[in-house]
Amino acid sequence: MFTRALLLSTTLVFGACASKPVQPELAGPPPAGKPGFEDGELVQAVSQHLGVTSESAASAIERLFAERGRPSAYITGEEGGGAFTIGARYGQGTLWMKDGRKERVYWQGPSVGFDVGAEASKVFTLVYDLDDPDDIYRRYPGVDGSAFLVAGMAVNVQRANGITLAPVRSGVGVRLGANIGYSSYTRKRGWIPL
């Protein structure tokens, strides 16, 4: 039984790695009249929330701005998770819209792949193309093997129904490997990560 699960997870991981990753088109600045956060605002917010230097925060923000443009919202929060081939991640935070609206959000999700370890981290998620806070509540697939490191912070991209999330994580623990899974954003805390 364990051999079948390991074979299945291996197939899924290598299949995900061999296929072209789902990447949203590179976005420039948002169209005129559409609100978006400026890089200076976000560098300060990332630095304060994640407890990193302004230079480290600027490195991550500059790369995301160059690839995706200005976000319409962001989420500040914390999360924890662990895995041994099959894993789970749980988090909570606050969604901050450019127009001043804010809302409490929770997320959880399963993963499968070559993945072992546990971590706890603070998360700063840039949110693109979100006009209504209610639209964030859905599943966002992702391949954590697609993450990149900038100044000691891990960043990956998730996308669903035209909304793109770019979580920036900084924390403690070790979780090594590559996995595929999704994060499900909800209004209430959930304990079952499906």
Regions found by a protein language model. Name each.
Residues 18-20:
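Bacterial signal peptide processing site
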